[in-house]
Each structure stands twice: as structure tokens, then as C-alpha cells.
Regions:
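Short beta-strand->loop structural element characteristic of the AMP-binding/adenylate-forming
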Residues: 1-12, 40-43, 90-98
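Conserved pre-ATP/AMP-binding loop-to-beta segment of ANL
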Residues: 11-31, 64-65
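Conserved AMP-binding A3 loop
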Residues: 27-54, 61-63
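AMP-binding/adenylate-forming
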Residues: 44-51, 67-120
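Gly/Ser/Thr-rich phosphate-binding loop
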Residues: 123-177
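Adenylate-forming AMP-binding core of the ANL superfamily, especially NRPS adenylation
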Residues: 141, 170-210
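AMP-binding/adenylate-forming catalytic core of the ANL superfamily
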Residues: 209-294
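AMP-binding/adenylate-forming catalytic domain of the ANL superfamily
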Residues: 289-313
Length: 317
């Protein structure tokens, strides 16, 4: 059920469309974000949606009539699944129009945000998250700076690992206590020939999925090093942009990403791409991080990054 809609008819229409699809279709459709390729439509059976919703509820210990909050786009899997969980599990859902910094004006048992939303909330209203008992993060890695700030809030914060193809999260990590992801019920992880993660989910009866994520396994879990298609080899050394970005996020406040350019000596040289202009950033700002040969050799400034509809930065080589 919907407890209230804070943003008018657009979110009410979105919920009504999802509810109609649930009541009238044998399968439920989800659109990928397009951050790693051409957007596509993926379908799941109602039984798979129900089992996914129940697994989430079990993990977070959420009962019928739980008060939950969402400010995610309804067109993609994270937002759509919040609405479907509310339908299946009889939650009271407050659904706010997507924004960079959602407004929390009540108390909630559970909420789902992107890492970018939480970072902006911490900057604008550091105590707002205290009104929520449990928070699920997704939509991209959490910066080290944001993770440190989250240790000061009372909320239980979890980062989910998953994608549209897995019907949202298949692994979780407690941001305050764990450095690695642990599989949810029925999920098994193995490593492919290229060091990439392979997912098997007997709980949802999904076929084995070979991802492009490069992972490092440890007891009971794994860490994500980066994506296979983003790896940079510079001077014969392999670098993962995502891992470097987590370190750099300690000191770089504006949006950025790591890329590479051809180099006669190194093959590829690492470059830092920053949103803004030359007045906003100087390379010496990161000297104390001791990045060694992984330090960017050049900074490229772009007035505005291209982003997906869900807010993810589109990397451009």
C-alpha cells in the first residue's frame, strides 16, 4: 500500500502503473540503466519477485506495515522493486520524487538510497539519516569520505551488491563493520577465468550470471576491485579505476573519474577527469595519498559530465 506520496501526481502515476502491471501481467519487466551498455528490458516471473522481496524483508527483519521510504526513479530496478516489495509485503511506502538530496520529515523502519544521495544528505543535513532505522545503499560504490561520516549516525547502513539481472541485491555489507560483501540466502559466488565474479542464485532459480566485475575473495565474502572493461594497464601494471577513485574521494569534492590516454612510454597513462574548470582543482592536492606510479599524470576538465537517468556518471575515454 501507499501511505503517502510527497511529490504529487508523477509518483502516484508511476506507482499505479507498477500496481497495474503486477495485477495484470504474468511477468514483470525491468529496464537496465545503460551505464555499462545499451539499455535493455529484462523480465522476471512474479514468483521470483516475491521470493526476492521476502529475502530482503528477512535480511532486514521487516514485517507487515513497516514504514519505508524511497526516492529512487521508478523506471529502474531499485525504485521499482521498492514499490513491488510494498505491494507484496504490505508495507507503508512513502515515495518521493527522485532528487540529489531527499527530504526526510518523519521516522522510518527502512529506506533505500543511492550512494550519491546519501553523500549529499550528509553534506546538507548530517543528522537526517538518524530518523531511519535501516538504510540500503546502491547505485555505485560509497566514497571513503562518506563511509567515515556514516559512522557518526545511529542508522544501520548496508551497501548492496547487485544489478538488474539479479533483481537487485544478492550480497550485502554492513558499512560500519565490514569491508567485504557477504552473499544472501541461496547465492553462491565463484570466479571466472578472467578473475570476474560469477553469480549463482538458487533462491530465485536464476541461471549462472558471469559479470564484468573483478573481485578479490576472502573468507565468507568478496571485495569489488573494479570492472573488467575499465582496467588500465600502465607501464605493465594493472590499475582498477574504481579502487583508485575510492581513495581519491577522500580529498576530491567535485565529481570525477579515472581514465587513461595513449602514451608512447607507458602504453597508457592514467588521467584524472574532473567536472569543473582549472580553478577548482590542482593535481598536487592528492600528493599526500602516496599513489606512487598510479598517480594521474594529467588532469582533464569537463564543464559537465554526461549521466544516466539514474545519476551515474558515464565514463568517456
Amino acid at each position: 500500500m501507499i501511505n503517502k506520496i510527497l511529490s504529487g501526481s508523477d509518483m502516484q502515476d508511476a506507482y499505479s502503473a507498477i500496481e497495474s502491471e503486477w495485477n495484470n501481467s504474468e511477468v514483470i519487466s525491468f529496464q537496465t540503466s545503460g551505464s555499462t551498455g545499451v539499455p535493455e528490458i529484462i523480465t522476471f516471473t512474479k514468483e521470483q519477485v516475491i521470493r526476492s522481496a521476502k529475502r530482503t524483508a528477512d535480511f532486514f527483519d521487516l514485517k507487515e506495515n513497516a514504514e519505508v521510504f524511497c526516492a529512487l526513479p521508478p523506471v529502474y530496478v531499485a525504485g521499482k522493486m521498492m514499490a513491488l516489495r510494498a505491494i507484496v509485503l504490505h508495507w507503508n511506502l512513502t515515495w518521493q520524487s527522485p532528487s540529489g538530496s531527499p527530504i526526510i520529515d518523519s521516522t522510518y523502519d527502512f529506506a533505500a538510497f543511492t550512494s550519491q544521495q546519501v553523500s549529499q544528505m550528509l553534506a546538507s543535513s548530517p543528522t537526517a539519516l538518524n530518523a531511519i532505522q535501516k538504510v540500503l545503499l546502491g547505485g555505485g560504490p560509497l566514497s571513503e569520505r562518506a563511509a567515515a561520516l556514516l559512522r557518526n549516525v545511529s542508522t544501520n547502513i548496508f551497501e548492496g551488491y547487485g544489478m538488474t539481472e539479479t533483481l537487485t541485491h544478492v550480497a550485502m555489507r554492513n558499512v560500519k563493520e565490514q569491508l567485504f560483501f557477504r552473499p544472501l540466502k541461496g547465492v553462491q559466488f565463484t570466479q571466472g577465468e578472467k578473475g570476474n565474479l560469477v553469480i549463482e542464485d538458487s533462491w530465485l532459480n536464476l541461471p549462472a550470471l558471469e559479470t564484468n566485475d573483478i573481485v578479490e575473495f576472502m573468507k565468507d565474502g568478496f571485495t569489488v576491485m573494479g570492472r573488467l572493461d575499465n582496467v588500465i594497464i600502465s607501464g605493465g601494471v594493472k590499475f582498477f579505476p574504481e579502487e583508485m577513485e575510492r581513495r581519491l574521494s577522500q580529498v576530491i569534492l567535485q565529481p570525477f573519474y579515472i581514465s587513461s590516454m595513449p602514451d608512447e612510454v607507458l602504453g597508457q597513462k592514467i588521467v584524472l577527469v574532473v567536472e569543473g574548470d582549472t580553478q577548482d582543482f590542482q593535481l598536487k592536492k592528492i600528493d599526500h595519498l602516496n599513489l606512487g606510479i598510479g598517480k594521474p599524470r594529467e588532469v582533464i576538465f569537463k564543464p559537465k559530465f554526461n549521466r544516466t537517468d539514474s545519476g551515474k556518471i558515464i565514463r568517456e575515454s
